[in-house]
């Protein structure tokens, strides 16, 4: 019985903690959702520009390295 309890107790604790988390969570209102969506979009754009400029810098470097052989 002790072996079963050692498996079941962590699962029971996890389920209890999960239920408590879900009860504490709330749906964002329109203002909060808009704020999060705008910040996420800005992050995507910034990361896109970083990737674009890195690619823009490394294309000529790669051509120099490959063209030298």
UniProtKB/Swiss-Prot annotation:
SUPFAM superfamilies per the record?
Preprotein translocase SecE subunit (SSF103456)
Which domain of life does the UniProt lineage start with? Eukaryota
Pfam families annotated for this entry?
Answer: SecE (PF00584)
Indicate the transmembrane segments per the record. Answer: 33-61
Give residues where N-acetylmethionine occurs.
1
Its Gene Ontology biological processes? intracellular protein transport; protein targeting
Q: Provide Extracellular-side residue ranges.
A: 62-69
Keyword check for DNA damage: no
Main localization is endoplasmic reticulum
Single GO MF annotation: protein transmembrane transporter activity
- Gene3D superfamilies according to UniProt: Preprotein translocase SecE subunit
Cellular component, GO annotation:
endoplasmic reticulum membrane
Of which family is this protein a member?
Belongs to the SecE/SEC61-gamma family.
Q: How does it assemble?
A: Heterotrimeric complex composed of SEC61-alpha, SEC61-beta and SEC61-gamma.
Q: What is this protein called?
A: Protein transport protein Sec61 subunit gamma-1
Originating organism: Arabidopsis thaliana
């Amino acid at each position: 019985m002790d072996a079963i309890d050692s498996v079941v107790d962590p699962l029971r604790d996890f389920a209890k903690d999960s239920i408590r988390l879900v009860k504490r969570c709330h749906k964002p209102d329109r203002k909060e959702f808009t704020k999060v969506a705008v910040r996420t979009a800005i992050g995507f754009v910034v990361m896109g520009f970083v990737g674009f400029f890195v690619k823009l810098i490394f294309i000529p470097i790669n051509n120099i390295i490959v063209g030298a052989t």
